[in-house]
Amino acid sequence: MTNFVFIVADDLGYADLGCYGGREPISPVLDKLAANGIKYINGYSNAPVCSPTRFALMTGRYQYWVRGASEEPMADNAIGNPELGLFPELPTLPSLLKDKGYHTALIGKWHLGYRPHFGPEKSGYMHHFGPMSGAVGYYSHTGTNKEHDLELD
């Protein structure tokens, strides 16, 4: 089986990386990875913030057809809300790959709904290392609710 890795970054512009025309040598490892692999040059995000984009990438659906894509990142009541997140019954890229025998892992923030109703393992990931929320202190690992938010399974 072919291995592949999706690298998704928040707030990254088209020409921020050297492999896409950036002038500053800030991404030599990613540039080398792109030079020795497949580099896509025609992909766009149709949302200005991160969570709706991840909803779309994970499901292959227009993100605003999936309840929670526009509400979850902004809602004060998102934590523990059973209606704001990526519903486990929706097929996702990781769940389809897992069904085909791939090992799946998410390294980084989930920010697609909170436990116990949602989570990476409910959407096809076998392993997760990172926060559930979208804003976590770099050193404290606490979320906006001031609780510890860093998982390793």
For each predicted feature, which ranges?
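Formylglycine-dependent sulfatase
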Residues: 1-153
